[in-house]
Regions:
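Soluble extramembrane regions of membrane proteins in the secretory/endomembrane system
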Residues: 2-70
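Glycine- and aromatic-enriched membrane alpha-helices
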Residues: 47-48, 52-454
Length: 454
């Protein structure tokens, strides 16, 4: 138990340090605030008094004042956006079950395959339940800069029985919303796959009950607060004028306030999970026979199938993070395709140069490396930037699972830190570079690469 507590505390601390490294040092209001001009008040128009007809024996009754302008109707979710988000949610589930489960299952020894499959599936299921109970509320409601509140326990308030309407969640476009219940489901899958990723770091040597206990505690004290700090904000409609921009930004999560860019979870998902997995591997210790016995994957066929399912599902993961079926979703979609392909080629080239030939395991690992690296950048960089990020990530993660792994000395069973940690860090840093408009990114002329990297 002491090791478990130490693991959680150290893991959360390192993850927070990693997040802070990607944050912008100067507070920057969300882009929506920069383009919203203060609403001009319409000048009051006074209708001239009607003159009484000359023949009228008495003055006419005064004309009634114009009716007050009706308040603007609340935005209505677009059916296309809603359908896209439900499909994206399904794709992320597909990434985990069976994608990640098969990817991990093929990498372990045959005697441990069913154990890993069960851990991935049950961990995902546990987190979905905890997300509905309290996780969503802690991550995506207004509280303070580090954690949300309990306003949405058991998703309370997403349905108004009296009015017969669903609550809406903001997107990144002013006046565009999606049903909050769809947003909650989408984010539940992110939380679930993040916790399932950690399983690979200490696979083949941890009791099932201990895995579930660790997962529940880590989710509560690490994932939910970090998701709030990086992703929670008040939405573009809250920035009704420049006068309130500062107040609205102050209500956002701590890392969001600092201007960090994380489109789909490079820090929240990958660096966060990788640090937890690395610390867990240190604390649990090495597998019996590690370094002495062969621990080669038992089925690269399953690993190939799992990697392919991850690639397909990742389109929902990245493009769905736009929260709308729009141009940014399309940009994230093609960047996910391009960066992954580039990383596969880079890993194979690096492996051929290092070992004399490429391998199926290398190609599958390269695909995951590219997917991880493009995650924080997907909707922020141009296609050229995605190509470069993929190539760099392929080589960097190959080093992460070989040279860096030996330097760290931890038995990270399935190279969670080497792929997700290194890939996440590379992606987070290069997002700061290639988001610049001059390099094909979506940021304007006032964007500073240096401040983002710092």
């Amino acid at each position: 138990m002491k090791k478990l507590i130490a693991t959680l505390l150290l893991g959360a601390g390192l993850a927070f340090a990693g997040l802070s490294a990607t944050a912008q040092t100067t507070t920057e209001a969300p882009p929506a605030a920069a383009v919203v001009a203060p609403a001009a008040e319409a000048p009051a128009v006074t209708a001239p008094a009607a003159e009484a007809p000359a023949a009228a024996p008495a003055a006419a009754a005064p004309a009634e004042a114009p009716a007050a302008a009706e308040a603007a109707p609340a935005p209505t979710p677009n059916k296309g956006d809603t359908a896209w988000m439900m499909v994206s949610t399904l794709l992320v589930v597909f990434m985990t079950i069976p994608g990640l489960a098969l990817f991990y299952g093929g990498l372990v020894r045959s005697k441990n395959m069913l154990s890993v499959l069960m851990q991935v599936m049950v961990v995902f299921s546990l987190i979905v339940v905890l997300w509905v109970v309290y996780g969503y509320s802690l991550a995506f409601t207004e509280g303070n800069a580090f954690i949300g509140s309990f306003d949405r326990l058991f998703l309370a308030g997403v349905w108004d029985n009296t009015a017969g309407t669903f609550a809406n969640a903001a997107t990144f476009s002013k006046g565009v919303v999606i049903p909050e219940i769809v947003f909650a489901a989408f984010q539940a899958t992110f939380a679930g796959i993040t916790c399932a990723l950690i399983v690979g770091a200490f696979a083949e040597r941890m009791k099932f009950s201990a895995v579930l206990l660790f997962t529940a505690i880590w989710f509560t004290f690490s994932y939910a607060p970090i998701a709030h700090m990086v992703w929670f904000w008040m939405g573009p409609d809250a920035y009704s004028s420049a006068d309130v921009a500062g107040d609205m930004t102050a209500k956002a999560g701590y890392i969001w306030q600092m201007g960090a860019l994380d489109f789909a979870g490079g820090t929240v998902v990958h660096i966060n999970a990788a640090v937890a997995g690395l610390v867990g591997a240190y604390m649990v210790g090495k597998r019996i026979g590690y370094g002495k016995e062969s621990m080669a994957p038992h089925s690269l066929t399953l690993t190939m199938v799992g990697a392919s399912l991850l690639w397909v599902g990742w389109f929902g993961f990245n493009a769905g993070s736009a929260l709308e079926a729009n141009g940014f979703a399309a940009l994230a979609f093609i960047n996910t395709l391009v960066a992954t392909a580039a990383a596969v080629l880079a890993w194979c080239i690096g492996e051929a140069l290092h070992k004399g030939k490429a391998s199926m395991l290398g190609a599958a690992s390269g695909a995951v490396a590219g997917l991880v690296a493009i995650t924080p950048a997907a909707g922020n960089v141009g296609v050229g930037g995605a190509l470069i990020i993929g190539f760099i990530a392929g080589f960097a993660c190959l080093w992460g699972v070989s040279g860096l792994k030996k330097m760290l000395g931890a038995d990270d069973s399935l190279d969670v830190f080497g792929v997700h940690g290194v890939g996440g860090i590379v992606g987070a840093l290069l997002t700061g570079v290639f988001s610049a408009g001059s390099l094909g990114g979506v940021k304007g002329d006032d964007y500073s690469i240096a401040s983002q990297l710092l």
